[in-house]
Amino acid sequence: MSQNGQFLEYTLQVIRRGVEMGGFPEDFYKLLSRPKRIIQVSIPVKMDNGSYEVFEGYRVQHNDALGPFKGGIRFHPEVTLADDIALAMLMTLKNSLAGLPYGGAKGAVRVDPRRLSRRELEELARGYARAVAPLIGEQLDIPAPDVGTDSQVMAWMVDEYSKLAGRNAPAVFTSKPPELWGNPVREYSTGFGVAVAAREVAKRLWGGIEGKTVAVHGAGNTGAWAAYWLEKMGAKVVAISDTRGTVVNKAGIPGEQILKVYMEKKRDKSATVLALEGEKIADSNASLYQDVDILVPAAIENVVREDNVGLVRARLVVEGANGPTTPGAERRLYERGVVVVPDILANAGGVIMSYLEWVENLQWLFWDEEETRRRLEAIMSNNVARVYARWEKEKSWTMRDAAVVTALERIYNAMKTRGWI
């Protein structure tokens, strides 16, 4: 997590720049620089040893001009309210850019979920759902998983909310297990979307992604699935890292093997990509510095900074994580001719899939995996095409500028039409 509100500061810089470049009034920035609502909750959990711990949680509802609030719930020991505000702001931009009928929100609990037993984790999840229940709902705020949470956590939360509501309420939470109103595509939707974004930009830059080399920073859900789908699309993954280090193999690292490690890690926390064939490097950031065509930072924010951007050698950076590149580092990359596909465009596959699941749940219908993936791919491809065309037109802009201004236009028009501005 960021220190001293740095991530929030960077996010506000992005919004400020977008407002200025888009020619929006100053009042628009003032309204976007503060969330509409901040919910702070205390969640008591009876631990396995019989004692009680009280965990601090948040739900930040940033802007709902376009529709219900939408964003994930993060369980992390170092999460701060400032981080949560920044992430909610990014969700507002991401949802707008994707053309979804959502505003932006984010939730968090300050906890290390790895230190909880399954029973303790379930009690915490249900406690959080109870605490925020009065201010969420299928037409109000629709949470989903994020770092430290998963489909099982969503299952506990939707069950708890349904008990409180006195009815089945599948559309209140998304990214649920397929056994409980979920869709199998959600497991890999973010990574798949990152791969689609990389493919579509590579097609326009170089004529295609076939044979292009890729390094992935982060072997969690987004990184592992992005690697898998990039290989399926014809690219060659030559480096990938996790918290224990980096493995490099110029001959290529099979996507199925990367996925296997990711799946093993769900059962055994000691599983690592260092078990894969190739050169082992103790530094997990070594994947950022490989001589490759495409870099996918897919772990945490602020990993490409002004103090290390000179070591980045990729020609194209596709942001799988939220905020992995600081504004100063991005300016340096831009000056060197390195293209950065911003997070609000590249990693929107997860929330687009959440939207599709929400639509299914509201209507009590179900699309099969192939149809769902087709719809997701079409939305991602169209979004990239729109942003790329605008970026080409505005020669002095970065692709993030094009994405942010495009997102802000939709939000501004909705707020103006409502009479909010």
Curated annotation (Swiss-Prot):
The record marks D146 as: Important for catalysis. Optimum pH is 9.5 for oxidative deamination, and 9.0 for reductive amination. Retains more than 80% of its activity after incubation for 30 minutes at pH 4.5-9.5. Is not regulated allosterically. Activity is inhibited in the presence of high ionic strength; the inhibitory effect of KCl is slightly higher than that of NaCl. The active site is at K106. Keywords: NADP, Oxidoreductase. Its EC number is 1.4.1.4. One of its GO terms (biological process) is 2-oxoglutarate metabolic process. CDD domains: NAD_bind_1_Glu_DH (cd01076). NADP(+) binds at T190, N221. It catalyses: L-glutamate + NADP(+) + H2O = 2-oxoglutarate + NH4(+) + NADPH + H(+). SMART domains: ELFV_dehydrog. One of its GO terms (molecular function) is glutamate dehydrogenase (NADP+) activity. Gene3D superfamilies: Leucine Dehydrogenase, chain A, domain 1, NAD(P)-binding Rossmann-like Domain. Optimum temperature is 90 degrees Celsius for oxidative deamination. Retains full activity after incubation for 10 minutes at temperatures up to 90 degrees Celsius. Homohexamer. Belongs to the Glu/Leu/Phe/Val dehydrogenases family. Catalyzes the reversible oxidative deamination of L-glutamate to 2-oxoglutarate and ammonia, thereby playing a key role at the intersection of the carbon and nitrogen metabolic pathways. Shows a high preference for NADP(+)/NADPH as the acceptor/donor over NAD(+)/NADH. May function in vivo in the synthetic direction. Also catalyzes at very low rates the oxidative deamination of L-2-aminobutyrate, and the reductive amination of 2-oxovalerate and 2-oxobutyrate. This is NADP(+)-dependent glutamate dehydrogenase. It comes from Pyrobaculum calidifontis (strain DSM 21063 / JCM 11548 / VA1). The lineage of its organism: Archaea, Thermoproteota, Thermoprotei, Thermoproteales, Thermoproteaceae.
